[in-house]
Amino acid sequence: MLMTQMTVEQFAHDLGMLPGLLLEQLQAAGVDKRSAADFVTEQDKTRLLDYLRKSHGSSGPRTRITLARKQTTEIKQSDSTGRPRTIEVKVKKTRVLTRQNEPEVIEKSVSEEPAPLKMVETPEPTIVKSVVDAEQMALRAEEARKRSELIARQAAELKEKQEKRRQQAAAQANVKKEPAPAEQESGPATAVTPGSVTEISSKLPETGAAATPATSTAPATTSTTAATKGHAPQKPVVKPEEKGEKKKKPTKQDAWKDEPVKRREPKARGDLSGGQEWRMRKDKHGKYKSDELQSQHAFSVPTEPVIHEVLIPETISVGALAQKMAVKAAEVIKVLMKMGSMVTINQMLDQETAMVVVEEMGHIAKIAASDNPESFLEEVDVSSDEARMEPRAPVVTVMGHVDHGKTSLLDYIRRTRVAGGEAGGITQHIGAYHVETSRGVITFLDTPGHEAFTAMRARGAKITDIVILVVAADDGVMPQTIEAIHHAKAANIPIVVAVNKMDKPEANFDRIKQELVNHGVVPEDWGGDAMFIGVSAKTGLGIDELLEAVLLQAEVLELKAVREAPAKGVVIESRLDKGRGPVATVLVQSGTLRRGDAVLTGAVFGKIRAMLNERGKSISEASTSIPVEIQGLSEVAVAGEVFIALDDERKAREIALFRQGKFRDVRLDKLQVAKMEDVFGQHEDVSTLNLIIKADVQGSCEALVYALKKLETDEVKINVVHSGVGAIIESDINLALASKAVVIGFNCRADLGARKLITSTGVDVRYYNIIYEAVDEVKKALSGMMMPDRKEKILGMVDIREIYRISKVGVVAGCYVLEGLIKRDALVRLLRDGLVIHSGSLDSLKRFKEDVREVKSGFECGLSLKNFNDIQQGDQIEVYEIVETARVL
């Protein structure tokens, strides 16, 4: 029978150390023992052992000893085919050995090897026989000698530590929180280590099991203590494993239950441990490494806020913005709600709003350039390299009133300056050509109308260098002339005035000068900067002087451009050719455009398959200020858009697709705003005219859409469902049928399939060749859709003189028509003392008991009001009607 309690002195004797030193360590472990006669319980021993393990960096103790066994059996069973099969079954049994109040049998774990002693060197643990032999006796003698040396060293160390203890008594009031100085100064002469306690357990010769390792539990310590006191220990009930059998690990359930280091809980965001216990590595003995070593390499969540640099494109969704800031989309939506915007996770934000949100959330907002493929264009742009620039030909636009001879002047210049044998050999629809003179080359642009010119200037493309303003000498300054002056002044373009029709006898050159001075165009001989040239497109008078003036103005401007570089320019016109596909007329502003180059204009890309000059001949390259017609684009380009030539077609495709996505986002954003406007405008009486517009060229289509959009008012709107270039096809008719739209064809016709569909469906299709006719027709249609003006017209005044109450009829008033007349279907107001008592209509109107349609002034009549009987003698009735008047735009 083992003792369950012993005194401190007995426990120190069993451990082979001085009682005073043991008292010191017990007090450091939080066990309140004052003298060597105090009893030590099993809980006190466990607390002392835990304290010693923690002080030496060992992992936490196991509170139980687990013994795992594996039993192998064989069973015979038939498989699916009926053949017998032998199946090997391995059964693992786990027994947990716990301490009892009066244990009769001490069970020991045999699953672990002994840990090396820290202070006393011990031989390699071996499985010894139950009979004590000579080798065991020699080992005991050696251990007794080493223990006596250890006791001597501990006695000297105790005196030194007690002296320091007295000096630090005030600072060491709380022993549990601050360990004793003896533990802080532990060195080669440390008092008692877990290894020394384990050393005692190795003195049991009768157990036949390996010594308990450094992490042995308190029950094992108790058994070793009893053995040192001379008690004859009993053999464990559990049979020790054979020598060749592998050691068993604790089961998963007991491991989770017994090892505190594995008891993990979900980590909150504020937990700085970073969940390091989840990723702790095991050593070669299957134990977790110490927390101190693991914490050196553990990841910890940053406590300081992380500031991101967010690149924001033109439009970005709420979810994408949250992803760039590494936050949840709900936080971004919350910030936007505080700013007064109700958004969803997929809603698009403009660049300015997104930057405000990023700054509000504490991050750095920057305009996106690194993830924009268009930044590649800035790298390859060498058009501004002044060192490589060479003089170029001027680009001249001829403007003026329609009837002032602008076309005749261009025809004369073209006819006389084109090489011999090619008279009239100019493709007129290109709208651009160049002529050669003795002093240089001049490129003319035939822009039919100021609308296209305004659109080009609005896009920021500097197409025109000089404007020739044509004014008829016999007509003077007209409204379109004034508009052309305003456009040239706004674009800061020099003007050369060509006073045409000087061959007529009624031409007045000075009057033209005076009228233009009133509009800000001052001639040079009057102190201004505009050159005035008198010309005649019929006789050729002054044509050479006009070209000289244009070239002189070009020299003053010092026009230069880079020739040996990728081409860059502007799309003048584009159309869809039935045989050649999308065709674009472009003006090269810098560089050299070659056949086979990859080109990019807006969201359209392609590779030049063919290139024609203004004479319709195929050419291989075009230099600066030369207009050419190119084929090979993916779709019809937008007139006025800038184009650039690239070496890599793949890069052109990437940029075009990026722009298409960007344009789509912007279009959807605008469409969403339009939908919100529609929601707020649903209660208003707004009529909408749906139109599908098809034209021969892109410029005409844009001009027609622009002109029709100007006809909109607050009451009538124009919705252009679709606009495009080319003939009217079946898909256009189907779209018009679905959207209830009117199809307008400008200089184009419907193909055979579309004509059959028009006949069967009855879709309204209108064809026009002149833009003003189309505008007038649409204006009339909009006028018919507008609500007419409603005006009130007073017909007469009636005085009520008698009141008659008739059963089944109601109140009938005998009246006298004072002025005007009273009609049966007219509206009336009942007036009493100048106040309106009732407004309504007549129920009946009689004269001499006969129904009449009207009663004129000076006659009597009887009448009754519909749904109103409160009529009194002396009241007056005002008779009126509503007159509707059609409105005109």
Curated annotation (Swiss-Prot):
InterPro entries: DNA-bd_dom_put_sf, EF-G-like_DII, IF2_assoc_dom_bac, IF2_II, IF2_N, P-loop_NTPase, Small_GTP-bd, T_Tr_GTP-bd_dom. Residues 158-296 are annotated as: Disordered. GO terms for cellular component: cytosol. GO terms for molecular function: GTP binding; GTPase activity; translation initiation factor activity. The gene is infB. CDD domains: IF2_eIF5B, IF2_mtIF2_II, mtIF2_IVc. GTP binds at residues 400-407, 446-450, 500-503. Belongs to the TRAFAC class translation factor GTPase superfamily. Classic translation factor GTPase family. IF-2 subfamily. Residues 400-407 are annotated as: G1. HAMAP family: IF_2_B. This is Translation initiation factor IF-2. Residues 391-560 form the tr-type G domain.
